[in-house]
Amino acid sequence: MADTKYIFVTGGVVSSLGKGIVAASLGKLLQARGFNVALQKFDPYINIDPGTLNPYEHGECYVTEDGHEADLDLGHYERFLNTPTTRANNITTGRIYQNVIRKERKGEYLGKTVQVVPHITDEIKRNVKLLGQKSQYDFVITEIGGTVGDIESLPFLESVRQLKWELGQNCLCVHLTYVPYIAAAGEVKTKPTQHSVKQLQEVGIQPDILVLRTEHELQPDILKKVALFCNVAPDSVVQSVDVPTIYEVPLVLQQQHMDETVLRKVGLQVGPVPEMRQWHEFLEMKHTAQETVTIALVGKYVELQDAYKSIDESLMQAAIYNRKKLNLISVHSEKVTEANVAETLKDMDGIVIAPGFGSRGVEGKLVALKYARENDLPTLGICLGMQCMVIEYARNVLGFKDANTTEIESNIEHKVIDLMDEQKTVTDMGGSMRLGAYDCALRKGSKLAAAYGKEFVRERHRHRFEFNSQYREAFEKAGMQCVGENPETGLVEAVEVPACRWFVGVQFHPEYNSTVVNPNPLFMAFIREAIKTRKKDKE
């Protein structure tokens, strides 16, 4: 295709409506029609990236293949499209201003007064078009974070306005709004949507397609009313009624021919219907699963729904492919004690020890791990979760009672987890960890190698601390095997206890490499083992 088509997804009325899901769903439908699609997210906050943001503030921090800390929506993009993202797929206001200031210091604007318009908006437009110019994408779908009317979104919306003017038919805007249901009146209200569109029009943008989030199905007269008062064609008003799972959203949009509407508006032939066989099979497995596998996720941010989003989704995908429903139980690690651990975990088929940073909640994770190991409960530790496995084993099996990570306590004898050598001179917090995909060689005959079905994998990382190799021999002799390591540095990236049915820890993050059509083998194997445990316990 000669010209890349650019689609912007904006949001109005309230935040958290699911712009990322709508963008990913539309991208999936276009991809299923044979188009090459890229998705990107523009966030209006001034942080360079979300790497230093507390999960309570922003939810999960996602990590791309090339080592960029990104918004969790990139996880949705990858899970829906089954294609990796990069640094170019997530831009923040902070990055935009940083780039402009750097150019100003280099003299690229010499003689000019640097302003929001045109310099900031030009930099935004440059980043929007970057993916389309560097790669052969037919569509670039850009999600604009925030809500129309927010001050911080104005430069992005001005950039969208300019691009719609510059690109003409090759650019369109999808606006997602909320249609509330007033229970007392027994009716839905479209006025918030009308006002949201009016705000968008005030900055010079006429939306081409409206997507209406609603809890109740909207009648044709409501859709016609919205079309009339928002100046949108009737066939360009799409409703997104709440569904049991986000993976049904592409089918909901397809049923209303949203992908066909997009193709017509950008001047392309509609062609055959999208090839969504695998997607339908996935949902069929989900809806027909009868039995349940119960997994405990032990972490310190479990009360926040988005804090471990990729782990939640990876476990759910693995359960579905194993023909089971997932019953995911959130266990706050700060609340786990020796007194209550047995009661807390007794009905679990397996547990996952979540990643994280800092000392809060670590002792609870250690208590949970001791119980799981001694009761042969299938356990998967991720990042800090693996490090906690090492600490627990050092204290309770090797007898190193003061064993710890130097992230928590440096004045100890047994530093079984220590700061990586290359991190010891690092002073900046942001973007300075060991980030992105690295190779890992797996030990032949290990449970981990069996899970992956190969002895060489590449997974993503996000950490500063590592297993202290000085203790490797002691751990091996005591029964904890180092079964994965970086072939270049020798860094231990995975451990397991062969005497247990499944007690595996990995320094990397397998959840960043699991999609709807390609679930991560490690989660698949873990869920299989949990199912076996459930059956054995029943017998």
From Swiss-Prot:
Gene Ontology annotations for the cellular component aspect, listed alphabetically: cytosol
Binding site for L-glutamine: 56, 356, 384-387, 407, 464
Highest taxon, organism lineage: Bacteria
Residues that coordinate or bind ATP: 16-21, 73
Xref: CDD domains: CTPS_N, GATase1_CTP_Synthase
Pfam families membership: CTP_synth_N, GATase
Catalytic activity, reaction form: UTP + L-glutamine + ATP + H2O = CTP + L-glutamate + ADP + phosphate + 2 H(+); L-glutamine + H2O = L-glutamate + NH4(+); UTP + NH4(+) + ATP = CTP + ADP + phosphate + 2 H(+)
Biological processes per GO annotation: 'de novo' CTP biosynthetic process; pyrimidine nucleobase biosynthetic process
The protein's annotated pathway: Pyrimidine metabolism; CTP biosynthesis via de novo pathway; CTP from UDP: step 2/2
Chain segments carrying region Amidoligase domain: 1-268
Keyword Ligase belongs to the record: yes
Regulation: Allosterically activated by GTP, when glutamine is the substrate; GTP has no effect on the reaction when ammonia is the substrate. The allosteric effector GTP functions by stabilizing the protein conformation that binds the tetrahedral intermediate(s) formed during glutamine hydrolysis. Inhibited by the product CTP, via allosteric rather than competitive inhibition.
EC nos: 6.3.4.2
Binding-site list for Mg(2+): 73, 143
Positions contributing to CTP binding: 15, 150-152, 189-194, 225
Family note: Belongs to the CTP synthase family.
Record note on quaternary structure: Homotetramer.
Protein purpose: Catalyzes the ATP-dependent amination of UTP to CTP with either L-glutamine or ammonia as the source of nitrogen. Regulates intracellular CTP levels through interactions with the four ribonucleotide triphosphates.
Miscellaneous: CTPSs have evolved a hybrid strategy for distinguishing between UTP and CTP. The overlapping regions of the product feedback inhibitory and substrate sites recognize a common feature in both compounds, the triphosphate moiety. To differentiate isosteric substrate and product pyrimidine rings, an additional pocket far from the expected kinase/ligase catalytic site, specifically recognizes the cytosine and ribose portions of the product inhibitor.
Protein name, UniProt field: CTP synthase
Annotated source species: Porphyromonas gingivalis (strain ATCC 33277 / DSM 20709 / CIP 103683 / JCM 12257 / NCTC 11834 / 2561)
Source lineage: Bacteria, Pseudomonadati, Bacteroidota, Bacteroidia, Bacteroidales
